[in-house]
Amino acid sequence: LPTSANQEDHVSMATYGARRLADMVNNAAVVVGVEAMAAAQGMEFDRSLKSSPLIEAQFAAIRQRVAFLEQDRYLAPDIDAMREWALQADWPAPLRACQPSHA
């Protein structure tokens, strides 16, 4: 990023970039959390159907954090709980293998 007409540009943008990356990670976690919450809500509509043990385990983890949505309610606490769920570090190995970074 030029700051002085391309002369003596010694300004590192790493700190700013890292702060932006932290915001992007949080925003992505909100999106993933909301998508998972919607998927869990959809699964509840017909619980006679079962999924894989891996999906069922994550479904149970989601339901520990967020109850079934029976009627309108303020969703900010649920969204925050799901953001924390999405940021967890202990994902099962098959899910970690699907991540681009294999984190």
Functional labels for PLM-detected ranges:
Residues 1-103:
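C-terminal auxiliary extensions adjacent to catalytic cores
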